[in-house]
């Protein structure tokens, strides 16, 4: 039998029908639903007189539009309130396996809530009307975002139409240095292959450095796969995966658990499996990263200087660099560790889990927010993350440092709620995108790890966390 990649196994086990041109009907196991991309889909079902094909495949929460402060005042923005209220009504009418509404203890960012509830399991196909659905590939699952019309199609048929992507292996060999996190690995990879490097591919991450990551680190890495242009990102199942899933609310139990684990252990690329493309990187080459421009690929290690567009020979790239520097208000040659910040945001589906908050708290402990830093927002990814952080006293560390301890939600990752930048504000952010206006009109976003963000908060500028022992 031909050796298969993990992607081959996941894809082939979910093909319902294949046409001559390679288009397939792909069966979907888990559908994650939030308030932004679901209203039109539910409305389409109503107009056609249809019901959900499988109610028990749907897990839902409100996250994009929910405020992360002053919950006693409710949702003030009328459009945001309408979307959240509409989700409430639609779930009550159509049903779901689980629904965590606004202010529920389990509510949170869909890509944080799903895994912590055990709604994401190895071997599944997982879709959501959100581009960062690739996060769930960390479990040895095939996960990717879909558009609103596909949301409706999945609700009605439990399938999507798709064509198989090419396969790519990105291996990081060796051991990561102290102070280097999964976020740094993700940004480094994107810096090396570019934001189009993974276009048309399903990416499997492998190598010693990847296997050493926790599940939360793997989720961060797979979350960022889309920023390299990939359709999906995934990590093979190992004991780390199985240990994380065990005893989660929606994980199998008893004999079903034993059978599931037996199957899950097969979710690895076979020896000799051939990928369409491979990249290999050395973990020793990766340092703490900071983006300097308006694309995740515009990234360098903290010891670098802002690049000079004049040294770029490609005229298209040179023009892009010039525009980025103008928007970001930076001058070529400026050391990254001399760039001051106005705002710090620690949160998002990339970096708002308990390990992320622990990393940030370790830096913030016994330190204070720098005088030039206007605000530091700490936004846990879910109510359960918030609860755990408070049990560990992390909230007290943040508050004593002068940071804001917020309620769960997508928050300042994107300007769809009350948390946003104003024109010209420079933000050290643990989110996944640094596009123009992503965090607010005219806002300037620098992507970093949680520890690097916390370091910027207490020093007032980008700082190598390895210098803060």
Swiss-Prot record:
Disulfide bonds: none
Family matches, as Pfam families: Aconitase
Any one Gene Ontology BP term: L-leucine biosynthetic process
Domain of life per record: Bacteria
UniProt GO MF annotations: 3-isopropylmalate dehydratase activity; 4 iron, 4 sulfur cluster binding; metal ion binding
Cofactor: [4Fe-4S] cluster
Chemical reaction(s) catalysed: (2R,3S)-3-isopropylmalate = (2S)-2-isopropylmalate
Protein residues bound to [4Fe-4S] cluster: 349, 410, 413
Protein name: 3-isopropylmalate dehydratase large subunit
Lineage, broadest ranks: Bacteria, Pseudomonadati, Pseudomonadota, Betaproteobacteria, Neisseriales
Protein encoded by which gene: leuC
